[in-house]
A protein has these predicted regions:
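Alpha/beta-hydrolase fold catalytic core
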Residues: 1-63, 87-90, 247, 315-319
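Active-site loop/oxyanion-hole signature of alpha/beta-hydrolase fold enzymes
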Residues: 43, 51-57, 97-135, 151, ...
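Conserved HGGG/HGGXW glycine-rich cap/lid loop of the alpha/beta-hydrolase fold
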Residues: 53-102
Length: 319
C-alpha cells in the first residue's frame, strides 16, 4: 500500500512539473502593458482593449464599422482590412476579447452572454447609439449573430468571414481535454500543439501585399502568451460557448432581414466550406464570396480580396 501511494505521489509530481513550468512565469496583465495607440474601456466584467481608426480624406460618412475577431487571434488580425474601410469614410473600432490580446482575463465563464455583453458594453462605453456595421471572423461570426439577435436595432449590416457554427463536435478522446483539472493541465502542457507554432495558418504563402506573413503573425500572436488567463479563457470558451452548431441562431437572423455578407474559403480546414450552404438555408438573402484557394486564414492571407468585397457591401448599405 505504501509503495502504491509513493508511486502515485511521484506520478503526480511528474505530471505537475510541466504544468508548473508553463505557468510559473506568466504575468498578470495591467494597463502598463497595453500599446499606447489603444486604450482600456472599463466594462462590467473588467477592462477591455480597444482602438479607433479614423477615416481619411473628405469622404467621411459618419458610420462605424466594428471588427470582432475569432477564438484565439486578437485584433491585429484585421491589419490588412482597416485602411480600405477608412478610405471609404468609415470609422473603424477594433477590440480584443476578454482573455485575449491586451484585454484583462477575468475568471468567469466565457459563454456567449459574456461576448455579447462585452460588445454591447464597449459600444455604450464609447457612446455609440446609432446602428453599426458588424464584421465577425470565425468565432466572431456567432458573436455578431447573437449580438444582432439581442440588439437588432443596433445592427446595420453583418459581414461574416469563415463563421463558426458549422463544425463537427468534439467527441471521444478529444472531449476529455475539456474536463475539469484534466483540461487545465492538458491545455497548458500541450499549448504549442493546440495553438502554437505550426497551427497559426493553413496557408504557408500569400502574394497579397497586405497579408500578414508568418513571422509577423507569430510575433504579434505570442505577445498575449506571457499573461495569465489566456489559456483559461480559450478552455472556458470551448466549455461554455457552443461554436459547433449555431444554426438555430442563424435561422433567427434570417427572419430579421438585415443585410448580410459572408466570405468563405473553399479549402477551409477549420469551418468547412459546406457550411456556406447551411448558412444560405438559414439566411436566404446572404451575399456569398467564395475564395477558391482560400483556407480559414483568408482574413489575413487574402485581405485585399476579402476587404474589397466587404467594402463594396458596406458602401451599398450606407444610409
Amino acid at each position: 500500500m505504501n509503495t502504491l501511494l509513493i508511486v502515485i505521489f511521484v506520478l503526480l509530481i511528474v505530471l505537475y512539473l510541466p504544468y508548473l513550468y508553463k505557468t510559473i512565469r506568466l504575468k498578470k496583465i495591467n494597463k502598463s502593458h497595453i500599446p499606447e495607440e489603444g486604450s482600456w474601456a472599463e466594462l462590467e466584467d473588467g477592462n477591455i482593449y480597444y482602438r479607433w481608426f479614423e477615416p481619411e480624406g473628405e469622404d467621411v460618412n459618419g458610420e462605424t464599422v466594428v471588427l470582432i475577431h475569432g477564438f484565439s487571434t486578437p485584433s491585429f488580425v484585421w491589419g490588412g482590412l482597416i485602411d480600405k474601410f477608412c478610405q471609404s469614410g468609415f470609422k473603424v473600432l477594433v477590440y480584443d476579447h476578454f482573455g485575449r490580446g491586451f484585454s484583462e482575463r477575468p475568471r468567469i465563464n466565457y459563454d456567449k452572454e459574456l461576448y455579447v455583453r462585452s460588445l454591447k458594453g464597449l459600444l455604450d462605453n464609447q457612446e455609440i447609439s446609432q446602428k453599426v456595421h458588424l464584421i465577425g471572423y470565425s468565432m466572431g461570426g456567432p458573436i455578431v449573430g447573437y449580438f444582432t439577435e439581442n440588439y437588432p436595432k443596433l445592427t446595420k449590416s453583418m459581414s461574416l468571414i469563415a463563421p463558426a457554427g458549422f463544425m463537427q463536435r468534439m467527441s471521444g478522446v478529444n472531449s476529455w481535454i475539456t474536463k475539469p483539472i484534466i483540461g487545465e493541465w492538458f491545455w497548458h502542457v500541450f499549448s504549442n500543439k493546440i495553438y502554437g507554432v505550426g497551427r497559426m495558418s493553413e496557408t504557408s504563402y500569400s502574394d497579397d501585399p497586405l497579408s500578414i506573413n508568418e513571422d509577423e503573425f507569430l510575433e504579434n500572436f505570442n505577445k498575449q502568451l506571457i499573461f495569465k488567463g489566456f489559456t483559461e479563457s480559450l478552455l472556458s470558451t470551448v466549455r461554455c460557448f457552443n461554436l459547433f452548431d449555431c444554426r438555430r441562431m442563424y435561422k433567427d437572423l434570417g427572419k430579421l432581414n438585415i443585410p448580410t455578407f459572408v466570405a468563405w474559403g473553399k479549402m477551409d480546414g477549420v469551418v468547412p466550406y459546406s457550411g456556406s450552404e447551411n448558412l444560405k438555408e438559414c439566411i436566404p438573402h446572404v451575399e456569398l464570396l467564395t475564395i477558391e484557394e482560400g483556407t480559414h486564414d483568408i482574413t489575413y492571407r487574402q485581405p485585399t480580396e476579402v476587404g474589397e468585397a466587404i467594402n463594396k457591401f458596406l458602401l451599398s448599405n450606407r444610409q
